[in-house]
């Protein structure tokens, strides 16, 4: 069953944590789409699991726009938030609205000025 029991997060190293500081930070974090921005870390869900990424781990963040062209229909776009560490993309979060990705990028820059945006 999903959602039952204690909140647990996986870090960039895929190790699980469940300390009270991160649980409280997650619950108080600002939600934008499928992501949350807390004071301690950036949180997101992927395939039913919750992940946390400390802001100092993120070297670069940017938006990638993907186009989908169905047969005999107009094209539609979806937006991806890409997070990079050590030259490798480690998170690829899909959003339907560009405004959500733009808002996250703005707030990431405010929370951690060392993150390269774009």
Question: Over which residues does each language-model region extend?
Answer:
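Anionic N-terminal interaction surfaces
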Residues: 1-39
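Acidic, Ser/Thr- and proline-rich intrinsically disordered linker/docking segments
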Residues: 2-4, 60-118
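Generic preference for well-ordered secondary structure
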Residues: 21, 26, 37, 42-45, ...
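Short strand-coil-strand connectors
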Residues: 31, 45-49, 86
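Residue-level detector of beta-strand structural context in well-folded domains
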Residues: 32-33, 40, 51, 81
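Phosphoinositide-binding peripheral membrane targeting modules
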Residues: 38-70
């Amino acid at each position: 069953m999903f959602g039952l029991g204690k909140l647990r997060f996986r870090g960039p190293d895929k190790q699980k944590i469940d300390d009270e500081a991160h649980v409280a930070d997650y619950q108080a974090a600002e939600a934008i789409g499928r992501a949350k921005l807390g004071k301690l870390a950036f949180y997101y869900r992927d395939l039913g699991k919750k992940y946390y990424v400390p802001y100092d781990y993120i070297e670069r963040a940017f938006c990638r726009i993907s186009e989908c062209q169905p047969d005999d229909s107009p094209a539609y776009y979806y937006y991806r938030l890409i997070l990079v560490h050590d030259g490798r993309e480690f998170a690829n979060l899909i959003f339907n609205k560009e405004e959500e990705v733009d808002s996250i990028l703005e707030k990431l820059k405010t929370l951690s000025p060392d993150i390269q945006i774009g």
